[in-house]
A protein has these predicted regions:
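Long, well-ordered alpha/beta core segments of mature domains
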Residues: 1-741
Length: 741
């Protein structure tokens, strides 16, 4: 093995590739924000003159720059591509990717082959960003520029919402795939289906290879890939066709020559380039000599003007044959069409219509073809479908509708926006909360319910949240409805038992307070029951804790739930409950998936470690599994998990994948069983350091404090009202634990 030196260029993970990547648990810290840790972007956005900003963007569209000339004298196509590629990395299954943070400005995205020359689009927007400063984030500006591009070419958009705060460093939590090199594709199973943890066909592409799957120009196979990939972005067939047909009504691709003429991508470019990459050595390297994908296609006769029939008419009217363009890439040319496509730089030159393999896929796939023909015959329906799909594409990762900012928010509410009913009742007071807790405590003492069950259901309700797209969570009590109620990890029978118990409590409370119009929502009651159970478990361990409670959650209704997008909120892996969904081939290890889940829950390493150890001793494993339950005092909030994990008498051996036996070194007696998630806290030296702190003779209070910090955080991740008022921040800073004896 090579020696590690702090002065060496290799990172720890380059020396030891299997080292857990814990940095993803403390990304983009407030200290990185030059405006300060308490910068209020919503407050700044409210000062913005949106009309003037849009007027400035309209001027950008038609003021062609010599250093990067605009095709057809209009940057609209380029700005649509920038907005699309910024938002289009969104994956519905974990909420990562997308336009948030303005992450397309950073590696790896700015260096992807699919994003060649988008660095120039960002640079063209800099004068506007400079003018408005902190009032508009890059993330919002990029999406707004896409909208203005469409509007300036005659298309009526559906609306715009701000609220995307900028990041100040790359997001390294997203698993983009297993490949080492760009444009490789090692992410399909034996059936040709993409692995569950990725959403694009190739490393470095946002969707599919425009030449065809793995470079094979087969439109039928391309249609399969398109359907699979767009579905992972929560788009149905009609939305998919609307987006492709609408987006490809503008602009062109660029393949004046092979991509071998391109210089290094922005992160690898020389310092004198000042952040710009892909400097081309082919002729002028710009304008008519531009190389981006290496494909040279102009779809319509009106590349800088909206015409709802242009792309669809070109696609469906003519017969296309395969060719290789000047860039050496596969593309399709209309063999029976006249030269009707204008050249972007030579007014005396015309071209035949051309298409990508992925465009022809819409023609050969029978379902897509039918939608195309419907849209061609009903242009107004197509315009509306494209407008709505574009809004969804560019706003899916912004979070629930409650987080939208600005005056252009559409009035119509779509189910995918996760709307919630308004609170139409009086919330419980402090004395009511005390009374409800007493009732729950009494039921636990009488054996009507258990600490384990109440904690498990509260966690199940809250832990669907993803900080990535701010969806999921306890508000709405969606766990009472399908598809949430039937998620395997929620243990439906266990869930039903707890819900019946809590529904009786709610019924009695609402009835007693009918005159005052006071009610307790199931969403609030589920969390309150979990809090109460943890307080009981702490008392059993010898400590008194009081978990602050903030009523204000509301119960949703079935009609508010979009079942198509809701299914993506199912946690198919949750190390906190020692759960991996059966019959899924995961690329990453269980312990890597734990870190992934912890990041989605916005947890720090100390909070994650404490929560795993605490939930184990509270007997909160999926299917009541004994693995990792290192205690003889279950349902007591002790540090037993850490004490027993670090027992020097234990020797662990693998029995089968993800199952280990811990036996006494002295006697050979089987003491415990564990999964990889359990054992990682004794194996990874950073997590072991945390475990040692919690296992120490004076470590139990420290453990409980960090457990409570993690618990309170997870239970309130979707309480955006509390985050705005910074109430939770103050609570987490002032957790008090008192010894009972």
């Amino acid at each position: 093995m090579k020696n590690f030196s702090g002065s060496g260029k290799l990172t720890l993970r380059e020396w030891w590739p299997n080292l857990l990547y814990l940095k993803m648990l403390y990304q983009n810290p407030p200290e990185l924000n030059p405006y300060g840790r308490h910068f209020d972007y919503a407050q700044e956005f409210a000062k913005l003159d949106l009309d003037q900003l849009k007027e400035d963007l309209r001027k950008v569209m038609t003021e062609s720059k010599d250093w990067w000339p605009a095709d057809y004298g209009h940057y609209g196509g380029l700005m649509i591509r920038l907005a699309w590629h910024s938002a289009g990395t969104y994956r519905a299954f974990d909420g990562r990717g997308g336009a948030k943070g303005g992450l397309i400005r950073f590696a790896p995205l700015i260096g992807w082959p699919d994003n060649v020359n988008l660095d120039k689009a960002i640079r063209l927007l800099w004068p506007v960003k400079k003018k408005y400063g902190k009032k508009i984030s890059w993330a919002d500006l990029i999406i707004l520029a896409g909208n203005v591009a469409l509007e300036s070419m005659g298309f009526k958009t559906y609306g715009f919402a701000g609220g995307r705060e900028d990041w100040w460093e790359p997001d390294e939590s997203t698993y983009w795939g297993p490949e080492v090199d760009m444009l490789q594709s090692e992410r399909h199973d034996e059936r040709g289906v993409l692995y569950q943890e990725v959403a694009a066909e190739h490393m470095g592409l946002i969707y599919v290879n425009p030449e065809g799957p793995r470079g094979n120009p087969d439109p039928k196979e391309a249609a399969k890939e398109i359907r699979m990939v767009f579905a992972r972005m929560a788009m149905n067939d009609e939305e998919t066709v609307a987006l492709i047909a609408g987006g490809h009504s503008f602009g062109k691709t660029h393949g004046a020559a092979p991509t071998s003429y391109l210089g290094p991508e922005p992160p690898a470019a020389p310092i004198e380039n000042q952040g710009l990459g892909w400097v081309s050595s082919y002729k002028s390297g710009k304008g008519p000599d531009t190389i981006t994908s290496g494909i040279e296609v102009i779809w319509t006769p009106t590349p800088s003007k909206w015409n709802p029939r242009s792309f669809l008419y070109m696609l469906l009217t003519y017969e296309y044959e395969l060719e290789k363009g000047p860039g050496g890439c596969y593309q399709w040319v209309a063999k029976d069409a006249p030269e009707i496509i204008p050249d972007p730089y030579d007014p005396n030159k015309k071209h035949k219509p051309r298409m990508l393999t992925t465009d022809i896929a819409l023609k050969v796939d029978p379902v897509y073809n039918q939608i195309c023909r419907k849209f061609l015959e009903n242009p107004e329906e197509f315009e509306k479908a494209f407008a709505k799909a574009w809004f969804k594409l560019t706003h899916r990762d912004l979070g629930p509708r409650a987080l939208y900012l600005g005056k252009e928010i559409p009035q119509e509410v779509s189910p995918w926006e996760d709307p919630l009913p308004e609170i139409d009742f009086t919330l419980p007071e402090e004395k009511d909360i005390v009374g409800l807790k007493k009732e729950i405590r009494k039921a636990i003492a009488e054996g009507k319910t258990t600490v384990s069950d109440l904690v498990y259901v509260a966690w199940s309700s809250a832990a669907t949240f993803r900080i990535s797209d701010k969806r999921g969570g306890a508000n709405g009590a969606k766990i009472m409805f399908e598809p949430f109620r039937s998620f395997e990890v929620n243990m439906p029978e266990r869930l039903d038992k707890v819900l019946r118990f809590l529904e009786e409590i709610k019924k009695d409370f609402d009835l007693k307070n009918q005159k005052d119009g006071k009610k307790i929502s199931m969403a609030d009651l589920i969390i309150l029951a979990g809090d109460t159970a943890i307080e009981v478990a702490a008392e059993r361990a010898g400590y008194i804790v009081n978990i602050p409670f903030f009523p204000g959650r509301v119960d949703t209704k079935p009609e508010f739930i979009d079942s198509f997008t809701a299914k993506f909120l199912e946690p198919i892996y949750d190390g906190f409950r020692n759960y991996l969904k059966s019959n899924i081939k995961f690329v990453r290890t269980p312990e890597e998936l734990l870190i992934d889940r912890a990041q989605l829950l916005a947890l720090t390493p100390p909070e994650m470690t404490a929560l795993v150890g605490g939930l184990r001793v509270l007997n909160c494993n999926f299917n009541y599994s004994p693995h990792g339950v290192f205690t003889k005092r279950p349902e007591s909030l002790t540090n037993d998990f850490f004490v027993n994990l670090l027992d020097e008498d234990l020797e662990w051996k693998e029995r089968e994948f993800n199952l280990y036996e811990g036996r006494s070194r002295r006697t050979g007696e089987l003491k415990w069983t564990a999964t990889r998630v359990d054992l990682i806290f004794g194996h990874d030296h950073r997590l072991r350091a945390l475990s040692e702190a919690y296992a120490s003779d004076d470590g139990e209070e420290v453990f409980i404090k960090n457990f409570l910090k993690g618990w309170i955080k997870v239970m309130h991740l979707d309480r955006f009202d509390l985050h705005k008022e910074r109430k939770l921040e103050r609570v987490l800073e002032n957790i008090i634990i008192l010894p009972k004896f």
